[in-house]
């Protein structure tokens, strides 16, 4: 299947499309606050189009936890018939490029259901590592446990941004 993959903004006009995609793709449902917040994150939320058909989406938020600036991937998914066509790669690269351009993120992370081997493989190809497993992370789905996958965006020897010493 040859096709054109494009990313587009999430707007009040197409947020229902995002909602429908998420309902089909993910085993968990997201509340209205999730969608309200998604409209505020700008480039961190994108719909993915395959030949002008909305087939997937990525939604992230900035998270300040563990004394770090982290990017959290809330959702990244694509309808089953359109998988393995490079759409997920395009969405993840979009997010990684934002982090790279910004230059102040310590890492990027997400939760993946422990049984979702294809997602785990996908993220590991991009240098994500399983850093912990959260018991009973999900409600009402089995298995309820989630792996936390994380990709470090700084070399361990680099000082955190804003702490670079100025030469006199």
From Swiss-Prot:
Stretches that traverse the bilayer: none
EC number per UniProt: 2.3.1.258, 2.3.1.-
Broad enzyme group: transferase
InterPro entries in UniProt: Acyl_CoA_acyltransferase, GNAT_dom, N-term/lysine_N-AcTrnsfr
Locations listed in the record: Cytoplasm; Nucleus
Catalytic activity as recorded in UniProt: N-terminal L-methionyl-L-alanyl-[protein] + acetyl-CoA = N-terminal N(alpha)-acetyl-L-methionyl-L-alanyl-[protein] + CoA + H(+); N-terminal L-methionyl-L-seryl-[protein] + acetyl-CoA = N-terminal N(alpha)-acetyl-L-methionyl-L-seryl-[protein] + CoA + H(+); N-terminal L-methionyl-L-valyl-[protein] + acetyl-CoA = N-terminal N(alpha)-acetyl-L-methionyl-L-valyl-[protein] + CoA + H(+); N-terminal L-methionyl-L-threonyl-[protein] + acetyl-CoA = N-terminal N(alpha)-acetyl-L-methionyl-L-threonyl-[protein] + CoA + H(+)
UniProt keywords, alphabetically: Acyltransferase, Cytoplasm, Developmental protein, Nucleus, Transferase
Pfam family, one: Acetyltransf_1
Any one of the GO BP annotations: mitotic sister chromatid cohesion, centromeric
Binding site for acetyl-CoA: 76-89
Domain of life of the organism encoding this protein: Eukaryota
Region (Substrate): 137-140
Recorded family membership: Belongs to the acetyltransferase family. GNAT subfamily.
Complexes and interactors: Interacts with naa35.
Descriptive protein name: N-alpha-acetyltransferase 50
């Amino acid at each position: 299947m040859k096709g054109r993959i494009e990313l587009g903004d999430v707007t009040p006009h197409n947020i229902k499309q995002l909602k429908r995609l998420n309902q089909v793709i993910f085993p968990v449902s997201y509340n209205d606050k999730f969608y309200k917040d998604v409209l505020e994150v700008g480039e961190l939320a994108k719909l993915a189009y395959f030949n002008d058909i909305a087939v997937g989406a990525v939604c992230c938020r900035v998270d300040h936890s563990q004394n770090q600036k982290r990017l959290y991937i809330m959702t990244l998914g694509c309808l089953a018939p359109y998988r393995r066509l490079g759409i997920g790669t395009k969405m993840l690269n979009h997010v990684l490029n934002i982090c790279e351009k910004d230059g102040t993120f310590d890492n990027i992370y997400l939760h993946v259901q422990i049984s979702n081997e294809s997602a785990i493989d996908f993220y590991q190809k991009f240098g994500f590592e399983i850093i912990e497993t959260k018991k009973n992370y999900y409600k009402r789905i089995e298995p309820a446990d989630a792996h936390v996958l994380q990709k470090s965006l700084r070399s361990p020897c680099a000082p955190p941004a804003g702490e670079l010493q100025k030469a006199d």
